[in-house]
Regions:
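Surface-exposed, interaction-prone regions with an acidic/low-complexity signature
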Residues: 100, 107, 125-145
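Metal-dependent phosphoesterase signature
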Residues: 40-92
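Short amphipathic alpha-helical segments
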Residues: 2, 121-124, 180-182
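Asp-based, Mg2+/Mn2+-dependent phosphohydrolase catalytic module
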Residues: 133-209
């Protein structure tokens, strides 16, 4: 989490307006989705390109979990990872645990408010090398919101698994509650800065079977 807030978010804000003049279908789709969301929330009329980028910056500062912001963050971070400016931070226990679980034939997947593109870049360019082959699937807010139980049902269906056969790990109690309501097993990850507040907790991936 600290890597996201201390490195990725500042990098996004620093480079955001460099993309204002970029003409691509991908950027246009993000701006169209931004305008649609502004209209739904505020009833605002059509905004120009600069105003839309300013709104994306405002959402970033508010840490809004909205799809167009997450999509643009993924694009900007992708360039940072590809140029080597960014390297994905993972705790020392993560890579060995992923290798162990993968060798045991367990299906590993990620669900994050960050876009699928950003997830793949972070784990594909980590300080421990490319960890992305360990994962069978990646999910983001296009699947649903992280505090909605139906999202976890959809994820289990996508993995062709019963929720009862899935273990969901998170540091956020509200997300754990949603996954539990969907029928998943849950464990809270208690890293530095996180307060233990769940019936099943782990401070290290090595503590998880």
């Amino acid at each position: 989490i600290s890597f996201v807030y201390d490195v990725l978010f500042p990098y996004f804000r620093e480079h955001l307006f460099e993309w204002e003049e970029v003409e691509s279908d991908e950027i246009q789709e993000i701006l169209t989705a931004t305008q649609r969301l502004i209209t739904e929330e505020l009833g605002s009329s059509s905004l120009d390109r600069k105003a839309l980028f300013k709104q994306l910056l405002a959402w970033s500062l508010e840490d809004r979990k909205v799809t167009p912001l997450k999509a643009l963050q993924g694009i900007i971070w992708k360039k940072g990872f590809e140029t080597g400016v960014l390297k994905g931070h993972v705790y020392p226990d993560v890579a060995p645990a992923l290798a162990r679980w993968h060798s045991e034939g367990k299906t590993l997947a990620i669900f994050s408010s960050g876009s699928v593109s950003a997830q793949k870049q972070l784990f594909g360019n980590s300080i421990n090398g490319d960890l992305s082959p360990y994962f069978s699937a990646f999910f983001d807010t296009q699947t649903g919101m992280k505090r909605d139980p139906q999202t976890y049902v959809a994820i289990a269906n996508s993995l062709s698994m019963l929720p009862a056969n899935v273990l969901f790990l998170s540091d956020v109690v509200e997300e754990l509650a949603a996954a539990k309501q969907a029928g998943m097993n849950t464990t809270q990850l208690v890293r530095p800065g996180t307060v233990a507040a769940w019936d099943s907790v782990a401070s290290n991936f090595s503590q998880i079977p």
